[in-house]
């Protein structure tokens, strides 16, 4: 019982530490392996986060209101006498309740369940012949980045191992602005025209009458959308249940335009190839984990970074000239189609290393926004109708 109350007090201290606007920045607790060595692979760092925070922080004299004012107690309100009503002048009570009432935001319509991490992108190959993007201007250049991984259709709190595509959203903090590359773990998509997107998403949500998932609605839509077949075949293979977020690739899905310093332009597609390999769960394994550890993928990512086993991806691009695009037998701007690698081979660009966990999930991850229209000099949109709709 005593430990239960200690846990409640510690949780309140964590809340007040986040709320105090004049507080000092906490020391990071995410990377115990400062020398780059890998920690215990069997240790659940996510489950030990509160205990780790307690050991690395002195909780004395840090209980504050949202304006940074010291607070003597969060266990009792000001009252008129021992049994009297509470006082309207109790700023601490009102501040606490106001914060509680407003601390959440509406969940994302899609990609509501997700995990994220901070990292660094390093250029390994010269691609200035294709683009003048600041983050790619020279070999060895380093750019901070932020990646968010997610399922697509599930509501907040649902299992992150469900059979579903995985969102693979990237934000690069370049010297010429933030570049958002919003992709998936699969190289194609269900539809090619953005006007179909609202109807498609509705089929992934609850039936408006029964408030239950409805496979009939989904298959009605997909059966009338034959271009979705390439995506369906992937989602209903083991690719639809990757073993966590680290052991899967990422794809920009859409075609983009790259422009170099001379004003010359080519089309391109982005690929992120996992250095952790490609490991998937079987349907049985995914179903079991959804019931026993619905946050399995989030836990796996957090623990890997916490023990110093930093996940890495190699960025590669496919390049297509305007002349090649004009001679193709298919539409290269159709998000339901692949560019054949034998005709448009992968070109190495750089490597991403995720090396820091979020310190405040709501602040760092839940409030993170990714906008496909956030581009920087050197990259432009293509005629891809689905990409245009995202703008």
Name each model feature, range by range.
Residues 6-11:
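Sec-dependent N-terminal signal peptides
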Residues 2-5, 18-391:
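Active-site-adjacent core segments of small-molecule enzymes
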Residues 14-16:
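N-terminal signal peptide c-region/cleavage motif recognized by signal peptidases
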């Amino acid at each position: 019982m005593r430990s239960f109350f200690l846990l409640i007090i510690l949780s309140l201290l964590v809340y007040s530490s986040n709320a105090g606007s004049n507080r000092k920045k906490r020391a990071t607790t995410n990377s115990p392996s400062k020398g780059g060595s890998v920690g215990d692979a069997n240790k659940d760092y996510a489950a030990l986060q509160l205990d780790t925070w307690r050991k690395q922080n002195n909780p004395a004299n840090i209980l504050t209101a949202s304006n940074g004012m010291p607070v003597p107690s969060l266990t009792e309100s000001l009252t008129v006498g021992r049994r009297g009503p509470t006082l309207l002048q109790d700023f601490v009570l009102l501040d606490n309740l106001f914060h509680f009432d407003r601390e959440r935001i509406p969940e994302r319509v899609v990609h509501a369940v997700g995990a994220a991490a901070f990292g660094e992108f390093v250029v390994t190959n010269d691609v200035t012949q294709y683009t003048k993007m600041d983050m790619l201007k020279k070999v060895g250049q380093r750019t901070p980045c932020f990646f968010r991984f997610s399922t697509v259709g599930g509501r907040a709190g649902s299992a992150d191992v469900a059979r579903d595509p995985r969102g693979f959203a990237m934000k690069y903090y370049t010297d010429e602005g933030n570049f958002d590359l919003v992709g998936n773990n699969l190289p194609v998509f269900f539809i090619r025209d953005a006007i179909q997107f609202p109807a498609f998403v509705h089929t992934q949500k609850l039936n408006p009458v029964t408030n239950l998932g409805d496979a009939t609605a989904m298959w009605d839509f997909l059966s009338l959308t034959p271009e979705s077949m390439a995506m369906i075949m992937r989602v209903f293979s083991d690719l639809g249940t990757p073993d966590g977020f680290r052991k899967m690739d990422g794809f920009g899905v859409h075609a983009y335009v790259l422009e170099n310093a001379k004003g010359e332009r080519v089309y391109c597609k982005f690929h992120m190839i996992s250095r952790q390999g490609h490991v998937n769960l079987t349907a049985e394994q995914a179903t079991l984990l959804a019931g026993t550890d619905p946050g399995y993928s989030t836990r796996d990512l957090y623990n890997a970074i916490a023990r110093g086993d930093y996940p890495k991806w190699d960025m590669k691009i496919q390049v297509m000239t305007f002349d090649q695009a004009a001679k193709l037998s298919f539409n290269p701007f159709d998000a339901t189609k692949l560019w054949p690698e034998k005709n448009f081979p992968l070109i190495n660009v750089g490597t991403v290393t995720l090396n820091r966990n979020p310190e405040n999930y709501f602040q760092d991850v839940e409030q993170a926004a990714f906008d496909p229209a956030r581009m920087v000099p050197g990259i432009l949109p293509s005629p891809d109708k689905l990409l245009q709709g995202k703008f």
